[in-house]
Amino acid sequence: MLPDHIIVDFDSTFITSESLDELAINKFGNHPNGKKLLSKIQSLTNAGMNGDISFEESLEKRMRLLKINQNDIELLIKKLSQSITPSFKKNKLFFAENYERILVISGGFKEFIVPIVDKFGIIKSNVFANEFLYNLSGDIIGIDQKNVMSKN
């Protein structure tokens, strides 16, 4: 008998990498200061994960450095779709059959998590993650601070 819910993280669990680090690689790969910026993003990721700074502070600082838009998110979705953990690929049918029980909880963002987990039958309402705030041009101007996932 299965439990009522199966809780799964996204970064380094559902996918093999950290999504914001991958976003930074996409964004800064050809930038003149790319290596330095990537290193700073990865340091902030690690500092937040290790508790050296709050998750909220880590997230805010990374977002300020990234300066991303909707196009960057679309490119990230394509890249992350190729980074699904082998065990998740192998058990895709299980996820599709048990979609109501599967909860994805992440410090990442719904905008790139939902399109990926949707391919496994996991429903949007079962994804608990941060959400971006956009301006009228489609540029990401921040994160929804009312979302509980943006906190520690």
Where are these regions (language model features)?
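Short, surface-exposed amphipathic charged segments that create phosphate/polyanion-binding patches used
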Residues: 137-148
